[in-house]
Regions:
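Transmembrane helix boundary and interhelical loop/hinge segments in multi-pass membrane proteins
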Residues: 69-89
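Aromatic- and glycine-rich beta-strand/loop motifs that create alpha-glucan
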Residues: 1-24, 226-234
């Protein structure tokens, strides 16, 4: 039995190794990029540690660093970012509320994108191995759970070495994923069901995230206009 499983895993890895390796590298780099970009934005160490822990708890959902960084900064333009923060602060919004709101918005968007992205390798594998062949549950587990889990552990250690954490909070966030990873091997779901659920949830959550971002941008613009009018009157 063990030899048969070993042969199946080796065969699967040979036919789709580049997809699996690229997916793993992608998953490793994301939290490192997020940690670095966020560290440049937030100077308060206590807030920084809290946001890091929250991001790592939700990892591997944070899979698109560009989107997350854009949401966090309010745009790539430094002047625009500072202007938005000044307007919000002038309207009585606390600094911590701003970061919490941006974190929630980025989580919603990145979770949807992540679920979509996790569905794409499944279809690529299906096309490589033959479009009409249904690949095994082991392949789905490897791509959806094993690769992100291993990548999370590697990137967690990298973040710890590069940027530093207090009181070992980073490693505590891995416990839920250990339990979740163990449950995956006892799953009775079929691969096609995983594909459908992943893509449908991804589309729904991503759409909701886009709506949230659009609404937040409109609110910021509204606040900006009101603030400019008030400054003109004063």
């Amino acid at each position: 039995m063990r030899n048969m499983l070993k042969k199946e895993f080796l065969l699967m890895f040979r036919t789709s190794k580049w997809i699996i390796l690229a997916w793993g590298v992608f998953q490793v780099l994301i939290p490192v990029v997020l940690v670095r970009e966020t560290a440049n934005l937030i100077q308060d160490q206590a807030t920084l540690n809290r946001l890091f822990v929250q991001m790592l708890v939700f990892y591997p959902m944070m899979t698109i660093p560009v989107v997350c960084v854009l949401v966090f900064t309010g745009g790539v333009n430094e002047e625009r970012r500072q202007g938005i923060l000044m307007v919000l602060l002038a309207n009585g919004v606390k600094q911590e509320q701003i970061w919490r709101g941006k974190l929630i918005a980025s989580l919603i968007v990145s979770e949807g994108i992540s679920l979509l992205a996790e569905g794409v390798p499944l279809f690529l594998l299906r096309m490589i191995n033959g479009f009409w062949l249904s690949f095994s549950l082991k392949e789905a587990i490897l791509l959806l759970f094993l690769v992100p889990f291993v990548a999370m552990a590697i990137s967690g250690v990298l973040c710890l070495i590069l940027w530093g954490f207090q009181h070992g909070q980073l490693f505590a966030t891995m416990i839920p994923y250990l339990l979740f990873f163990g449950c995956c091997f006892t799953s009775v779901f079929k691969v096609n069901l995983i594909e459908k659920v992943s893509l449908l949830l991804g589309l729904g959550i991503f759409s909701a995230g886009v709506i949230v971002v659009i609404i937040s941008e409109r609110l910021v613009a509204l606040f900006s206009n009101e603030h400019i009018v008030n400054l003109g009157r004063s």
